[in-house]
Amino acid sequence: MKCKIVTFEEVHNMVQNLSKKIRSSNYKPATIVGLARGGWVPARLMCDFLGITDLISLKVEHWLETGKTRDEATIRYPLMADLRGKQLLIVDDITDTGKSLIASTNYLRKFAPGDLKTATMQYMPTSAFKPDYYAEEVKVWTWFIYPWNWIEDTTTIIVRLMDTKKEEVWSSNAISTGLEELFEVRWNQKMMSHMLRIMDERGQIGRTKGGYRLKETKVVHL
């Protein structure tokens, strides 16, 4: 599984470019709907770029963990908002299957909005739903590690890596090399040390002579 680390500067630039496309289309949303969890930060940035103060959140459950999905996307918590006649803009970080956008648009249409459009930072042609606006088309399937989920994603792929040789003691360098070989991603040593410390505190790994050993952890393989 190919992974790519996305910096906050890259996120900022993608949302800024996305906002320019929306303005150029003359669509003027009154309310932005950020899809939780991945769409929260892009939605807030979009509010800033478009000068919109009305922001609501919609929790859509689709991804279980890094690279693993449910069969269908579902709305976790119902909205208690009056959206009748409003121009809505749904914002998410990426669409690769399209299930989150399909579920959210179908749900929000029940609120009788005046209009409803969708925007994502990134769009993969594998998606069953093409958003109205996107900043970047991703032609090769990639798992993007955004600033808001780098701990969640990186701990998951480290556990998967260490589970391939669960009895071994892994050094920090061996983990870095393994991540690069299996997932095409590499953290610098400072960030790797920080990540391993977090995993040790959470009880996912144990520090031992020569490095770290994986503890009993549920591992989902792709």
Feature roles, as predicted:
Residues 1-222:
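PRPP-associated nucleotide enzymes
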